[in-house]
Amino acid sequence: MAREGHEVILLEKNSSLGGRARQLVRDGFRFDMGPTFYWMPDLIERFFADFGQKPQDHFTLRRLDPSYEIVFAEGNRIALPAGEQAVTALFEEIEPGSGKFLRKFLRSAEFNYRTAVEKVIQKPGRSPLELVMPETIVRLPQFVRSVAHTIRRGVKDVRLRRVLEFPALFLGARPEQTPSFYRLMNYADMGLGTWHIEGGMAQLVAAMERLARTLGVEILPDHPVRKILVEGNHVRGEATDRGRF
């Protein structure tokens, strides 16, 4: 909106921006207090590209290898390597034949990811009918079957099942209740990889804040909004502890 010439004021409840992506700095150490995984880097790239910039203009990104390590209740561990080829080799080593399933699964996951990113998330989210399009109609069974059902049909090793079900847990959902279409997150995980921002996730927040300020956005911390002022069907302003805007 600021880029289009509108006056924009951002009212922030806390003393700093970021919300859950805040950072604790103590004794020379920095701790991410919320999100730690930098997934789906292409979406962040698109955001900065809208303003003629790149994420690397603001912070240093490093792809993690291994991406992460899963520790099971029995004490077993699986360190997930970076890159589809390496992950496929790991699956094949643990369960011969599972690599073939994984390759097919990830190609389907990539298609779902591209569909979601390029066509679905651009919609306003006002109706479930926004999901109806040729790309989703042909995948209707994936909306009525769970991702756990699909994974457990293709992989027998319990540990590998848990690895493939992890992205659903990452979304805060149960794999048994998550539509199989959301296998798209497996592509985000194994295809696009897990990245780390040098200095922590707060660097992304700081980059967005700098960008907003360069566009003329006025940012007011310590301004909790108490009420949205509505007249008729129109929002006329917001009431805070420090005045009305």
Residue ranges and their predicted role:
Residues 11, 162-164, 220-221, 240:
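General beta-strand structural signal in soluble alpha/beta enzymes
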Residues 73-179:
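Rossmann-like flavin
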Residues 11-14, 179-183:
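Active-site-adjacent bridging/hinge elements
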Residues 184-241:
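Helical element adjacent to the flavin cofactor pocket in flavoenzyme catalytic cores
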Residues 73-75, 240-243:
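Glycine-centered tight beta-turn/hairpin loop motif at sheet-sheet or coil-to-beta transitions
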Residues 17-19, 171-172, 227-229:
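Flexible loop/turn segments at secondary-structure boundaries
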Residues 1-114:
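N-terminal glycine-rich phosphate/pyrophosphate-binding loop and immediately adjacent elements
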